[in-house]
A protein has these predicted regions:
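Residue-level detector of conserved catalytic or cofactor/ligand-binding positions
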Residues: 441-454
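Active-site neighborhood of glycoside hydrolase catalytic domains
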Residues: 255-265, 335-421
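Acidic/aromatic-lined carbohydrate-recognition and catalytic surfaces
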Residues: 56-292
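Short, Lys/Arg-enriched N-terminal segments with co-localized hydrophobic residues
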Residues: 33-37, 44-55
């Protein structure tokens, strides 16, 4: 359960100043699935007589799209998504928090994705494709969707989902074929989508086609011409694999159309979408493949250092995540252009944006890529406020929420304060630490800008 804004009040009361009236309401209890969540009336902002914006309390629920009910192995952008929006609106909730909508790869985590820009093909609603005449009921019944309807079987899903999506693509491509199948006439909104997203879509579709051709191996294991992005080799591959490349564009097109419909429905109901992005990209990703100078590279063009966390009382060896580290000096030279693109794209998908591992923008743990543990790492300085100033100059005021959990240096807390981004509180953390952690985690004494979780 997510609470945003001012702390809860124990009694319903009215506060009045010279111009404005603010009403606070108690939360009541609403039983959902297993256990209880707290539901209350949402009031967003008001003005005091001094003219300052006063952030009011609002609340919502964290529900990953993958956890929505459905008959085809995983939650998606279908009927259940709209019904969940209806539930939130009826319960007085104004925020639906979801996990990143990025494609999942090995490990099935949206925080280790093959693309920082693409959407998860698993979330495309198959029943919508059936209504569009791209699939039949027999197509859906022919596949296995897992034995347990309450759990996602990603191994089964990987086989069945893409098999069905390829059938839908074949039907769509056939529908778009011109006379004798020599020319394809795609819908106007498809052309608009590919044009609006060409800065990442072309590379992503080519990358995925190459992964399929290489039996889904990490790109660092591809033959040198493809690994090193030889222009002639890539052009020849693209010409020979036009249909496969088109499939990956088609899936992203359908993902975008369906998700934007869900988001528009939520916004009409007064519900904002709170999404998220990880700070780092995956080593096995199109971003790493095309990024080049965006990352710390050695003389051979391989990643010089990778991300992780230092040893602590949870792990004597620390955490070796393996994500490539950004070359922040290069990003600065470009005016943080890649980050501007990334955040602009994310804000086209979400209304509010949670950035994971916020502390990494202040200081981050850098580990030699050859290390087998995180012990050999060292702290390095991140871009700090320079990055957020560049983002705000390009995009305006940023609706960002910072994931600032865990032990933080004073400099991290200063960066959070300077950015004015809301941080996070988790009520459960109050019961596992010392007195200071207890006080920091209590949601009823939260600072007005905190987002609190129970």
């Amino acid at each position: 359960m997510l609470f945003a804004g001012a702390p809860a009040h124990t009694a319903c009361k009215r506060q009045t100043n010279t111009k404005y009236t603010t009403v606070y309401h108690d939360f009541c209890l609403w039983k959902i699935v297993c256990g209880y969540v707290m539901i209350g009336t949402s009031i967003k902002t008001d003005k005091t007589k001094r003219g300052r914006e006063h952030i009011m309390r609002e609340s919502g629920i964290l529900m990953p799209v993958s956890s929505l009910p459905g008959p085809y192995g995983i939650g998606c952008f279908g009927k259940a998504a709209l019904e969940f929006v209806d539930f939130l609106a009826e319960a007085g909730q104004t925020i639906w928090q979801i996990l990143p909508l990025s494609p999942t790869g090995y490990g099935d985590s949206p925080y280790q994705s093959c693309s920082a820009f693409a959407g998860n093909p698993y979330f495309v609603d198959l029943e919508t494709l059936e209504k569009e005449g791209l699939l039949t009921a027999a197509d859906l019944k022919a596949e296995s969707w897992g034995k347990d309807p309450l759990e996602v079987d990603y191994g089964t899903l990987y086989v069945s989902r893409f098999a069905v999506l390829r059938k839908a693509y074949a039907a769509w491509r056939s529908r778009c074929a011109g006379l004798h199948g020599c020319t394809y006439y795609y819908p106007d909104d498809y052309y608009a989508f590919t044009l609006a997203n060409e800065d990442w879509l072309e590379d992503y579709a080519l990358y995925m086609a190459l992964k399929v051709a290489n039996k889904m191996k990490n790109w660092v294991e591809w033959n040198a011409p493809y690994r090193r992005r030889d222009k002639a080799a890539l052009a020849a591959f693209a010409a020979a694999n036009e249909e496969e490349i088109g499939f990956w564009k088609f899936v992203q097109y359908k993902f975008s159309v369906q998700w934007q419909a869900v988001k528009a429905y939520a916004n009409e109901k007064g519900v904002q979408i709170l999404g998220g992005i990880p700070i780092y990209v995956s080593a096995d990703s199109v971003d790493a493949w095309v990024g080049g100078k965006l990352f710390e590279l050695d003389a051979d063009g391989r990643f010089a250092r990778v991300a992780g966390c230092p040893p602590d009382y949870f792990s004597a060896d620390g955490q070796l995540w393996g994500n490539p580290l950004y070359d922040w000096a290069y990003h600065k030279k470009t005016g943080y252009a890649w980050w501007v693109r990334r955040v602009r794209h994310a804000l086209g998908i979400y209304d509010l944006l949670r950035i994971d591992h916020f502390r990494g923008f202040d200081t981050y743990w850098a580990i030699p890529a050859t290390s087998t543990t995180a012990r050999t790492g060292k702290w390095e300085n991140g871009p700090g406020m320079e990055l957020f100033d560049a983002l705000e100059a390009a995009l305006g005021k940023l609706p960002i929420i910072a994931e600032d959990l865990g032990e933080l240096f004073p400099s991290v807390r200063k960066l959070l304060a300077d950015s004015t981004f809301p941080g996070m509180k988790v009520l459960q953390f109050a019961f596992g630490g010392g007195d200071n952690e207890y006080l920091l985690s209590l949601i009823h004494i939260s600072e007005p800008t905190r987002r609190s979780y129970i």
